């Protein structure tokens, strides 16, 4: 049984939360999954199913596109119109979607409040004080992780306000609205990167990760070894992802087409692949599958080191600006925006826990206040900006969104450490990857030098954002 000690220890840690057989049967029939040995979000509740059905059944308005054609919006096409170069198209798209959500706001409020009530009821049934405590405890996490994330990001909102002002200047706008936040600020990083060049640059960029990481990465990036399904072909799904099962090497599925974005995605997906591979090499089956909280750490660290590598080697100011703007957008959307989502989620659960009735007005007002606070005085609120919560499925996923923000913040902090400290930091990072699920996630992350119960790692990501802002502003002034 020794090889299964971590798994059994984790079960024992939560044994006090088990109810009697009859009570367990009842809560299982009602859909409780706090004890399920699968991802919490693989079991949708009836509230989540109803939310999905409502989104599917909605008829979205038509708008006039940049060519003057009448086009019907869908949730699939909405992001494209939201970032249109034509400001009127963007305004129409956001207004149409948020206006439609507002028309059905009481139904959306009912599905979300029902989900949150379930979260709270299941937590209380097992003796937890809050739903946050219950759903983090499944992975052995302290609620201080979420509190620290929200507090640290709130302490640095002045940087996001600077970014909004910068975006307004770059776009020549007197007022910045929600429909102005998604327009690309540059044409993107224009690089033609055939796979052999991408392989070489990724290996060179990730050299600070240490010899072990390099050896496995080189093996995986060699197509002859069977890790990669590299190029698009008929009947192949779009996008990119990494997949693994215990035993053989992981697989990385790409649709590589020789662009910078493809190279960055390749580095990202190999972060997932190497995490899984190193954990499988070091751990038995019961302890190799790392939790979602750690899933984006290696992937984002890879992306940061690749970005640093390219910035250090480019003399092209347009390319440099594009790389820097991309970094700003990654931190804005993944740390600032996902933290705003996490704060909304915590606030709404708090309403239920204190007995406050959840209404559409309360949800809209709460979200609107967050948008105003996060984006600051340079941002102009529109009538239905408080409705964005209504179509975001992650609010049904039981404290999930925060891990996007902590993952990127951890990746930035680890990239900083291996760049500055070299081999000792690389060894600590590799130790974390090899750990799989053999220790509590926070303990594993501390091996890599990151403690998310304290502000340091999150502050590092804020300083990266600030430094990048400074450089973009300087480039504009020249």
Locations of the language-model features?
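Active-site-adjacent bridging/hinge elements
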Residues: 124-129, 133, 175-178, 238-249, ...
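Active-site recognition of the HExxH zinc-binding catalytic motif
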Residues: 127, 257-278, 299, 304, ...
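Short, glycine/acidic-rich hinge or "gate" loops at secondary-structure transitions
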Residues: 118-125, 166-180, 215-221, 282-288, ...
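A well-structured
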Residues: 1-188, 199, 475-478
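Post-HExxH zinc-binding segment in Zn-dependent metallohydrolases
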Residues: 290-319, 327-329, 333, 407
């Amino acid at each position: 049984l020794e090889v299964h000690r971590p798994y059994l220890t984790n079960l024992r840690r939560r044994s006090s939360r088990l109810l009697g057989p009859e009570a367990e049967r009842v809560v299982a029939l009602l859909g409780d999954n706090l004890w399920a040995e699968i991802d919490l979000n693989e079991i949708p509740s009836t509230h989540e199913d109803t939310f999905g059905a409502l989104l599917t059944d909605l008829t979205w308005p038509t708008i006039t596109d940049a060519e003057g054609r009448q086009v019907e919006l869908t949730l699939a096409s909405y992001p494209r119109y939201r970032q249109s170069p034509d400001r009127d198209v963007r305004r129409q798209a956001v207004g149409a979607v948020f206006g439609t959500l507002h028309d059905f706001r009481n139904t959306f409020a009912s599905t979300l409040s029902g989900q949150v009530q379930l979260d709270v009821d299941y937590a209380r049934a097992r003796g937890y004080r809050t739903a946050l405590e219950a759903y983090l405890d499944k992975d052995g996490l302290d609620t201080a992780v979420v509190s620290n994330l929200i507090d640290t990001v709130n302490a640095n909102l002045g940087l996001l306000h600077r970014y909004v002002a910068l975006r307004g200047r770059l776009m020549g706008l007197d007022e910045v609205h929600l429909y102005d936040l998604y327009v690309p600020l540059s044409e993107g990083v224009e690089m033609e990167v055939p796979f052999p060049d991408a392989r070489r640059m990724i290996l060179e960029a990730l050299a600070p990760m240490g010899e072990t990481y390099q050896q496995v990465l080189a093996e995986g990036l060699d197509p002859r070894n069977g890790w990669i399904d590299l190029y698009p072909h008929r009947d192949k799904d779009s996008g990119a992802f990494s997949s693994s099962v215990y035993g053989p090497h992981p697989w990385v599925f790409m649709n590589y087409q020789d662009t910078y974005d493809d190279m960055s995605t390749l580095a990202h997906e190999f972060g997932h692949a190497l995490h899984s591979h190193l954990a499988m090499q070091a751990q038995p089956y019961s302890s190799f599958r790392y939790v979602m909280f750690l899933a984006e750490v290696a992937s984002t660290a890879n992306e940061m080191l690749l970005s640093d590598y390219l910035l250090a080697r480019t003399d092209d100011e347009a390319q440099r600006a594009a790389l820097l703007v991309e970094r700003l957008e990654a931190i804005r959307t993944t740390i600032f925006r996902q933290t705003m989502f996490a704060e909304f989620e915590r606030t709404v659960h708090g309403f239920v826990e204190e007995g406050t009735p959840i209404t559409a007005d309360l949800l809209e007002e709460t979200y609107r206040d967050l948008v105003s606070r996060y984006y600051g005085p340079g941002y102009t609120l529109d009538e239905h900006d408080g409705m964005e919560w209504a179509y975001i499925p992650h609010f049904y996923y039981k404290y999930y969104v925060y891990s996007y923000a902590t993952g990127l913040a951890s990746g930035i902090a680890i990239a900083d450490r291996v760049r500055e400290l070299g081999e000792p930091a690389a060894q600590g990072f590799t130790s974390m990857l090899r750990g799989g699920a053999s220790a509590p996630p926070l303990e594993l992350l501390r091996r890599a030098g990151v403690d998310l119960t304290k502000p340091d790692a999150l502050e590092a990501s804020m300083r990266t954002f600030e430094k990048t802002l400074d450089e973009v502003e300087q480039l504009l002034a020249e």
